């Protein structure tokens, strides 16, 4: 695509990365997990997400190094977050958990622990030694232009070069986000399973009570 550059994220991209994470967490709804689970306002959450990104921990969704930025005609258009699960011996869940525990107020962590039994009803483990596509976000003005496909393919190709034997890419999406499911199918993902919680309380905590796991196999 003429005028398109896909590059590594850097510290100057943090404001846009924070926006990306917030919008991905909401998944097209008004439910924001940093508020419902941790009890933070959106502004408090943004500041804490920024602080976690500044820790520069690799290989999870709160890592600057996990992001690629799409720039079209010198304007930031979107971003992806992806990483190789367990690349340095630790799971992304553990890395993210460590960042949350280190950064957020103790009261927020205790609140989340109380809600943990409910949240586990939708938890899907990441597969080790696979590429995990953590999130994809495009600004509204840049949607419907085919940028999602280019951004995802570029990021997968980059990670594949780091570990050539990788053959699987996974993405998790809330099942009611039909636009996202459709977009992932267009770029080669297939639905392999879904997980639904029967606990109605989860609808007050997360955007939906069902998650879909999708897989793209690499040659």
Task: Give short role names for the model-derived ranges.
Residues 1-15, 19, 23, 28-35, ...:
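Conserved N-terminal entry element of GNAT/NAT acetyltransferase domains
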Residues 39-67, 71-72:
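Active-site rim helix/loop that mediates acceptor-substrate recognition in acyltransferases
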Residues 71, 103-105, 136-143, 174:
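A short, internal acetyl-CoA/4′-phosphopantetheine-binding micro-motif in the GNAT/acyltransferase core
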Residues 86-130:
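Conserved acyl-donor/pantetheine-binding loop and adjacent beta-alpha core of acyl/acetyltransferases
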Residues 129-131, 159-172:
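Conserved GNAT acetyl-CoA-binding A-motif
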Residues 135, 144-158, 182-186:
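Conserved acetyl-CoA-binding loop-helix of GNAT-fold acetyltransferases
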Residues 165-181, 185-187, 193, 197-219:
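C-terminal "cap" of GNAT-fold acetyltransferases
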């Amino acid at each position: 695509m003429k005028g398109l550059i896909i590059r590594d994220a850097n510290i100057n991209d943090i404001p846009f990365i924070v926006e990306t994470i917030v919008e991905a967490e909401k998944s097209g709804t008004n439910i924001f997990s940093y508020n419902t689970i941790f009890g933070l306002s959106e502004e408090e959450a943004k500041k804490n997400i920024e602080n976690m990104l500044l820790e520069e921990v690799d290989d999870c969704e709160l890592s600057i190094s996990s992001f690629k930025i799409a720039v079209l005609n010198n304007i930031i258009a979107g971003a992806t977050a992806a990483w190789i699960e367990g690349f340095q011996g630790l799971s992304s869940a553990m890395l993210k958990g460590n960042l949350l525990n280190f950064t957020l107020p103790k009261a927020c962590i205790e609140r989340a622990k109380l809600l943990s039994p409910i949240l586990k009803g939708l938890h899907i483990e990441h597969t080790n030694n696979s590429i995990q596509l953590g999130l994809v976000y495009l600004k509204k003005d840049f949607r419907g232009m085919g940028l999602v496909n280019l951004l995802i393919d570029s990021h997968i190709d980059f990670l594949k070069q780091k570990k050539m034997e990788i053959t699987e890419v996974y993405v998790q999406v809330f099942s009611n986000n039909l636009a996202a499911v459709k977009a992932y199918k267009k770029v080669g993902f297939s639905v392999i399973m879904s997980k639904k919680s029967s606990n109605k309380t989860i609808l007050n905590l997360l955007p939906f009570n069902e998650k879909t796991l999708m897989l793209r196999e690499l040659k």
